Amino acid sequence: MTDLYAEALATFAALYAEAQNSAELEASAMTVATANVDGRPSARTVLLKAFDARGFVFYTHLDSAKGRDLQTHPQAALLFLWRSLREAGIQVRIEGGVQLVSADESDAYFASRPRMSQIGAWASRQSQALGSREEFDAAIAKVEATFAGREVPRPDGWGGFRVVPQAFEFWYGAKFRLHERWRYEADAASHWSKRMLYP
């Protein structure tokens, strides 16, 4: 891990801790932007579940729209927006390649989830058409009956993705739109640079 990458990661960690201790309702909420095989972009909000020097991890159904996007075009952008921080909010953007996390990591995280969240992962065919809420409720009841009295295992089609950063951008909001921006970026040889940008 290079010094600049370590600096960017430490900056994120400090801001994330600040957000967790602030008025933010959900500091771990992040927008994940992906593109499908045709290059059509889409974005949605998910929760950050872990981060370290290897990257930023979230979990989902692998056959969801974002799961399919990431398996055919393994690049993503993350966006954190913490409006309550500092003078006028802080925004962090992270861009990078995407990898599936290991089965062991996915198993460990799935085992830590509330039981009804585990059941929901089995009952939901995420991003597919649903005829009615009653249909979903029936699927939930069926899964509950299937696993009554025993642990709920992780479904094969559910797991984690790790975004491996190739760029960080930190935006510090200020009055009169006189913001401050810093960008850390790796080149093709994984050499990191740091630049200040006009707001």
UniProtKB/Swiss-Prot annotation:
State the disulfide connectivity: none
Entry keywords, A to Z? Flavoprotein, FMN, Oxidoreductase, Pyridoxine biosynthesis
Annotated residues that bind substrate are located at: K49, Y109, R113, S117, R177, L178, H179
Tell me which Gene Ontology terms the entry assigns under biological process: pyridoxine biosynthetic process
Q: Which GO terms describe its molecular function?
A: FMN binding; pyridoxamine phosphate oxidase activity
Q: Which residues bind FMN?
A: R44, T45, V46, L47, L48, K49, Y59, T60, K66, Q91, Q126, S127, W171, R181
Q: Has keyword Lipoprotein?
A: no
Assembly and oligomerization: Homodimer.
Q: What NCBIfam families does the annotation carry?
A: pdxH, PRK05679.1
Which PANTHER family is this protein grouped with? PYRIDOXINE-5'-PHOSPHATE OXIDASE, PYRIDOXINE-5-PHOSPHATE OXIDASE
Q: What is this protein called?
A: Pyridoxine/pyridoxamine 5'-phosphate oxidase
Question: Which species?
Answer: Xanthomonas axonopodis pv. citri (strain 306)
